[in-house]
């Protein structure tokens, strides 16, 4: 297998407390021999099932990291998305997928629990997820 064929991009939030999102999927894929690129969409003080979580939006960082990887010529055999903090983040991933046409794509539309959107998310996020999932 070519070295670039083992690169997987993980796009998800990073809770500083909790065993979900980037904290969960990374170790499994790493143990399977994949080279992982982690692209955090937001950094949270804790998981969103608590009454309060401090959040840092990572949209601008995502833009810069994707540009840096493009400059290096990094290609991905797989792209796995989870929680997206803004609809603009879906646009960034769609732009990447237009360049990386052979990547296997898995979209997990993490945006709600119990029929209610997570704080700060809404219909625009749902539409962005629909567009991304249809790719």
Residue ranges and their predicted role:
Residues 58-61, 85, 89:
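Soluble or luminal CAZymes and related metallo-dependent hydrolases
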Residues 1-78:
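Small-residue (G/A/S/T)-rich helix-start motifs and N-terminal tracts that mark the onset
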Residues 12, 83-84:
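Conserved residues at beta->alpha junctions
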Residues 81, 87-135:
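Conserved beta-alpha-beta core of the PfkB/ribokinase-like small-molecule kinase fold
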């Amino acid at each position: 297998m070519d070295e670039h064929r083992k690169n997987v991009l993980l796009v998800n939030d990073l809770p500083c407390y909790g065993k979900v999102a980037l904290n969960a999927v990374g170790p499994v894929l790493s143990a399977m021999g994949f080279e992982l690129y982690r692209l955090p969409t937001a950094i949270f003080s804790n998981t969103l099932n608590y009454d309060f979580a401090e959040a840092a939006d990572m949209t601008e960082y995502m833009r810069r990291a994707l540009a840096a990887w493009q400059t290096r010529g990094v290609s991905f055999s797989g792209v796995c998305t989870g929680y997206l903090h803004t609809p603009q983040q879906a646009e960034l991933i769609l732009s990447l997928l237009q360049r990386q046409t052979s990547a296997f794509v898995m979209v997990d539309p993490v945006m709600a629990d119990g029929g209610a959107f997570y704080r700060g998310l809404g219909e625009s996020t749902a539409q962005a997820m629909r567009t991304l999932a249809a790719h």
